Amino acid sequence: MTEIYIVRHCEAQGNLKRLFQGVSDFDITETGAKQLEYLKKRFENIHLDKIYASPLIRTRKTALAVAGGRDIEIKDEPGIIELNGGVVEGKPFKETFNSIPGLAETWDNHPEDFAPPQGEKMRDAYERIWNTVKRIAVENSGKTVALATHGGITRCLMCRLLNGDITKLASTPW
């Protein structure tokens, strides 16, 4: 049986500052560094054949913690990178979302229709992550792997697994 562990990155600077991080390359905070230690301990007795990481510093550091110094291949996987926020990238959630008509309401109540200007549509990210995870599962049949990824991507994946329908994204927990 193939096993896939899904790990959201530890706290990053953008989380602390309440920014839309998206594909911006924010580093881990001091709290995030402590979380990395807990994560290392949590995975120390779990056999992993490979770890896939979104190619951002916060997920790479998370993947290294999951590996815990063991000789486990860590592979950059762009298919599990966070949603590209376009014009909202790296900006404060509240102020930015409220400055673009309809964006905050869509994010809160109909996230499946979220499509920031110059960014990635949520529906595209939803399909991207699902296709990536299916490919990884096939490539690692019978193995155990971990994915170091992001909150939005994890939520999309959980929605797909639990509900099978992106229209249920608003009711899918983070």
Task: Please give the residue ranges for each predicted region.
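Glycine-rich phosphate-binding loop signature in dinucleotide/nucleotide-binding domains
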Residues: 44-47, 136-143
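Short beta-strand scaffold positions
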Residues: 53-54, 127, 148-149
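Short, active-site-adjacent cap segments at secondary-structure transitions
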Residues: 13, 58-60, 82-84, 153-155
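Domain-level recognition of soluble alpha/beta enzyme cores
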Residues: 165-174
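Active-site-proximal alpha-helix that buttresses catalytic centers in soluble enzyme cores
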Residues: 7, 11-72
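Short, hydrophobic/glycine-enriched beta-strand segments
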Residues: 3-9, 147
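Active-site metal-binding loops of divalent metal-dependent hydrolases
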Residues: 10, 144, 151
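Phosphate-handling substructures
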Residues: 69-130, 170
